[in-house]
């Protein structure tokens, strides 16, 4: 797990992860989950071969960005990268307490069975 507690000084963070999901705990007691397929044996073209990024553009927003692997397409061919999005009720941690990462994992795993 990597838990980001506040917007970083530089707006974009990149990571190499094959977990296949990212989640964001929102202050309105919702958990936003993105699931996606990973390809450990394929090349990723992000600057450092990263598979996910978290971006904090200006203003009150955040982007969770899974990155697909490189595709070489011939004229007329089509490529795609699918993300599944879910919202789940999940109490935002009170000031001075930690996010319950086991509960987050259980929520994500519950989507896998659907």
PLM feature spans:
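A contiguous, surface-exposed recognition patch within enzymatic or periplasmic domains that forms
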Residues: 1-78, 90, 95-102
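Short, surface-exposed secondary-structure boundary micro-motifs
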Residues: 84-86
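Short peripheral tails and domain-boundary helices/loops at the edges of structured domains
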Residues: 99-114
């Amino acid at each position: 797990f990597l838990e980001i507690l506040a917007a970083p000084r530089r707006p974009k963070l990149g990571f190499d992860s094959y977990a296949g999901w990212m989640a964001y705990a929102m202050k309105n007691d919702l958990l936003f989950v993105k699931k996606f397929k990973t390809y450990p044996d394929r090349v990723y073209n992000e600057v450092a071969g990263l598979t996910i990024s978290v971006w904090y553009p200006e203003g009150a927003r955040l982007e969770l960005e899974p990155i697909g692997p490189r595709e070489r397409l011939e004229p007329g061919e089509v490529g795609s990268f699918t993300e599944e999005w879910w919202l789940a009720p999940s109490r935002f941690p009170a000031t001075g307490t930690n996010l319950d990462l086991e509960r987050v994992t259980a929520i994500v795993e519950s989507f896998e069975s659907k």
